[in-house]
Each structure stands twice: as structure tokens, then as C-alpha cells.
A protein has these predicted regions:
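Ser/Thr-rich, low-complexity intrinsically disordered terminal regions
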Residues: 21-161
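Positively charged n-region of N-terminal signal peptides that target proteins for export
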Residues: 1-4
Length: 161
């Protein structure tokens, strides 16, 4: 009888403890695809794209040719682009707030796969500002993967999904 009782207690303990230890899914999930172009060509193309605000509306933050990593940021994202790129999980009170401003920071990592092929990974971090009167709430938002796919297309992928 004692082993049965211990088994039941152990089961109840694990049943209540396990949900508390559940791992939350990451908010920033990278998108990736292979581009049939040499890595130096892809790096130069993306660096030029992010360096020209009239083309991409992004500001180049850094471009490291050694690690083949590019970071760019766009502030003051218009609401049409925002609705296309990201969604924000808010509480019931914040649901009546209106989108006021947002920023998107993208990190592009390149890896050489073959002499004429590059693996491109794009991760986007979205931060939204929502207002109701004088109250403002900043929210870390999740991607719809549209922006990441656009950047992978700019890199030269024929099917950016």
C-alpha cells in the first residue's frame, strides 16, 4: 500500500510542477533560405540595400564582413507596413490602445554553403508603441515573417519561404 501511495504523491507532484516549468516559445524566430549566389555578392547586395534609406527605409547599424552579419533598424514604421509585418499580443486593457509607433531591427546572418551558394538567415525584432490619450504602452511584438521573406528575396532567393 505504501508504494502505491508514494506513486500517487509523486504523480500529483509532477502533474502540478510540469506546467510551471513549461518552456515558452521564443518571440524572435529566424527565417532562412538558400540563395544561389556567392556569399560576398549577397553580403554586398544586402549592405547596399540597407545603406540606402530611399530603397529600404532602414538604417544600417552594422555590417561585419568577418562574421558576415548585418544589423539594420527601421524606426517610425507606418501602420500599413506594421500590420503587414507584425502582431502584438496585448492584455484586455491595451486592446483599445491605438498603434502610435514601431521599430523593426533585423539581423541577417550569412553562411557559405558552396562556392556559388549562400545560406541566409533573417531574424526581426519588432517593438510597438500603443497609445490611449497620454498613456503609452511599449510592446514586444511577434513577426508575421513577411519582412524576413522580403529581405531574403532581396538577397536573391527565388522562393523566400
Amino acid at each position: 500500500m505504501k508504494p502505491l501511495c508514494l506513486s500517487i504523491v509523486a504523480f500529483l507532484f509532477l502533474a502540478t510542477l510540469t506546467p510551471a516549468l513549461a518552456i515558452e516559445q521564443p518571440r524572435i524566430v529566424p527565417r532562412a533560405n538558400e540563395v544561389p549566389k556567392p556569399i560576398d555578392q549577397v553580403f554586398a547586395r544586402l549592405k547596399k540595400y540597407f545603406s540606402d534609406p530611399s530603397v529600404s527605409h532602414f538604417q544600417l547599424v552594422s555590417a561585419d564582413p568577418k562574421t558576415r552579419t548585418i544589423v539594420a533598424k527601421q524606426s517610425s514604421v507606418d501602420s500599413a507596413s506594421w500590420n503587414n509585418w507584425a502582431f502584438c499580443k496585448t492584455g484586455p486593457v491595451e486592446m483599445i490602445y491605438k498603434y502610435a509607433d514601431g521599430s523593426a531591427t533585423v539581423t541577417v546572418k550569412l553562411e557559405k554553403t558552396t562556392k556559388h551558394s549562400t545560406f541566409v538567415s533573417v531574424a526581426a525584432d519588432f517593438q510597438g508603441a500603443y497609445r490611449l490619450g497620454s498613456n503609452e504602452n511599449k510592446v514586444a511584438c511577434e513577426s508575421k515573417f513577411v519582412l524576413e521573406d522580403q529581405i531574403i528575396s532581396v538577397a536573391g532567393a527565388s522562393d523566400a519561404k
